[in-house]
A protein has these predicted regions:
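Intrinsically disordered, low-complexity segments enriched in small/flexible residues
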Residues: 1-108, 276-316
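Terminal peptide-recognition signature
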Residues: 15, 55, 111, 158, ...
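Short hinge/gating elements
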Residues: 26, 60-63, 124-128, 269-272
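Short active-site-adjacent helix-start/loop capping segments
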Residues: 70-71, 119-121, 163-165
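Glycine-rich beta-alpha loop segments
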Residues: 91-93, 99, 104-156, 174-179
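Conserved catalytic cores of soluble enzyme domains
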Residues: 157-287, 295
Length: 316
């Protein structure tokens, strides 16, 4: 797979291109090992320096990287015996939210998440991860199933927001989001939400109102996209960077506000740079958090979840 470089990664991309050029030349013009090693060290240093000082707008670009692991990648890398459940039993099946039953390190769980797709064809199938009412009603159905059988709920959040189309609104988009959020909050089983890329607006909250909320290091979580905020505040979507800088959408800001409980470190260069390592890190943290919640009663889980939401934004 060809590497997709972000705008701010252009200096790194230039160095990588020089390395590739020297590797090709070495096949016909002798060895350039010393030069290649020097350039690789320089690229590594530049990557470390760049990713150590990402601003919120840069993190937004990383969170949206097309090669970042998606829900289907986490399912393949972390779970076994996955059985997908489809449909909301009212209108149809929404492929923007996928979910079903699986085993996580041998234990049964219910999982669900937004799926954006990795290429043009799959992005259309999954509607770029923007769910319609059927997706949120499917999520409620899965959560009902989890509570009935006492299974933990694991959700993976990666969406720009709920789909704002006419049909979705006619079929009760706002009500479906509200019902899904309510069901998250009233679950009597352990629930953990992991924000893996974008966490956009109510479309994200609908499956992220969990007992524990985790967030990958370079993901974002906000009530509106930076472009949308810029359009509303300044009537100028080009000021998205200004909006991102002001909105407190990054993981450290959200931990400070008590919206997020824990940050999952990403490999150098972002989760897309080493997908296997990123997925493994998520699995290890999920196992720790699930173990901490597994001994609580349904009433204790509901109270702890309520307490964490009441504490959001409060000092102390």
């Amino acid at each position: 797979m060809a590497v997709h470089y972000l705008e701010f990664e252009k200096p790194i991309a230039d160095l990588e291109a020089k390395i590739e050029e020297l590797n090709l030349l070495s096949a016909t013009s002798g060895s350039f090992d010393a030069e290649v090693d020097g350039l690789r060290k320089k690229a590594e240093q530049l990557r470390r320096k760049t990713y150590a000082s990402l601003d919120p707008w840069m993190k937004t670009q990383v969170a949206r990287h097309p090669q970042r692991p998606h829900f289907v990648d986490y399912v393949e890398g972390l779970f076994t015996d996955f059985v997908e459940l489809k449909g909301d039993r009212q209108f149809g099946d929404d492929q923007a939210i996928l979910g079903g039953l699986a085993r996580f390190r041998g234990a049964p769980v219910v999982l669900m998440g937004h799926e954006k797709g990795h290429d043009t064809q799959t992005r259309v199938v999954h509607n770029f991860g923007m769910a319609r009412p059927e997706g949120y009603r499917k999520a409620v159905r899965l959560m009902d199933l989890a509570e009935r059988y006492g299974l933990p709920v694991l959700t993976f959040v990666d969406t720009a927001g709920a789909y704002p189309g006419l049909g979705a609104e006619e079929r009760g988009q706002a009500e479906a989001i509200a019902r899904s959020t309510e069901r998250c909050l009233t679950l009597g089983v352990p629930s953990i939400a992991t924000i893996t890329g974008e966490g956009g607006s109510g479309g994200a909250i609908a499956i992220a109102a969990a007992g524990r909320v985790l967030m990958l290091e370079h993901s974002i979580y906000s009530v509106i996209s930076p472009e949308g905020a810029a359009g509303i505040l300044w009537r100028d979507g080009a000021r998205a960077r200004d909006a991102a800088m002001a909105m407190k959408i990054t993981a450290p800001d959200l931990v400070e506000l008590k919206i997020v409980d824990r940050i999952i470190p990403e490999p150098l260069g972002g989760a897309h740079a080493d997908r296997e390592a990123a997925i493994s890190a998520v699995g290890d943290v999920l196992a720790e958090e699930l173990a901490a919640l597994s001994g609580l009663t349904p009433d204790q889980l509901r109270k702890a979840r309520a307490d964490r939401f009441y504490a959001i934004g409060r000092p102390g």
